[in-house]
């Protein structure tokens, strides 16, 4: 029995003919906007109906428990605390669920690679909260209704922002996630310019913590 899985590690690169097409999604590679993290996953194999599909949110770390279940390994034999959940129940008719140790899903980008600077997103149910560390800004979207992320609900729903931010802070602390910190000696004029002639950000990441499990 052979299963074939097709997936991408991130969204569109955002420029050039070979960078991919992100359609109406915001952002691109190097961000946690939907254009940077949303990409299709295709699985073909025994027992999977042709032309079946679902909109369940999945992530790369779901593959390990999926492989184990296909191989007949009982789920209670897997290491405690793994973040992923098996996708097998989704493959029959697309109506199953993925059981993970946490209901929320986090994408963490503690770098200055993009104009947004270090930022993180947390998903819970239909909501997505984005946190931008340099500006202190939050953005809240109902992804089920606004996949293009055009209607920021943060001002309308401050309690939801606070609740999701609390979950986010707890998660990043639990996994000892890498965070960006100010470097007072950084001179942006000494940073090599990019292809558009722009210099680097005013503050450069100076890591003092080892990388955790948050990912983008």
What are these regions (language model features)?
Residues 1-49, 59, 197-216:
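Histidine-centered active-site microenvironments of extracellular/periplasmic hydrolases
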Residues 1-2, 78-82, 181-182:
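Short, glycine/acidic-rich hinge or "gate" loops at secondary-structure transitions
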Residues 1-4, 39, 101-102, 124-127, ...:
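Loop/turn elements at helix/coil->beta-strand transitions in domains of secreted/extracellular proteins
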Residues 12-23, 27-34, 49-50, 56, ...:
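C-terminal cap/loop subdomain of S1 sulfatases and analogous C-terminal strand-loop tails that border
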Residues 63, 134-137, 143, 148-216:
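Long, internal low-complexity/basic segments
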């Amino acid at each position: 029995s052979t299963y074939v899985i097709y997936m991408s590690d991130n969204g569109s690169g955002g420029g050039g003919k070979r960078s991919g097409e992100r359609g109406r999604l915001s952002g691109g590679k190097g961000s946690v906007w939907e254009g940077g993290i949303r990409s299709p996953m295709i699985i073909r194999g025994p027992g999977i109906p042709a032309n079946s599909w679902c909109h369940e949110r999945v992530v790369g770390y779901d593959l390990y428990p999926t492989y184990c279940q296909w191989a007949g390994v009982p789920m209670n034999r897997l290491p405690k605390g793994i973040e992923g959940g098996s996708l097998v129940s989704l493959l029959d008719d697309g109506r199953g669920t993925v059981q993970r140790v946490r209901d929320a899903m986090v994408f963490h980008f503690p770098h200055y690679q993009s104009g947004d600077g270090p930022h993180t997103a947390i998903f819970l149910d239909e909501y997505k909260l984005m946190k931008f560390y340099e500006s202190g800004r939050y953005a809240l979207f109902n992804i089920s209704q606004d996949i293009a992320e055009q209607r920021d609900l943060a001002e309308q729903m401050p309690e939801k922002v606070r609740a999701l931010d609390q979950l986010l802070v707890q998660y990043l602390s639990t996994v000892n996630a890498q965070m960006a910190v100010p470097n007072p000696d950084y001179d942006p004029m000494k940073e090599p310019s990019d292809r558009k002639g722009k210099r680097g950000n005013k503050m450069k990441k100076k890591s003092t913590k080892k990388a955790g499990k948050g990912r983008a």
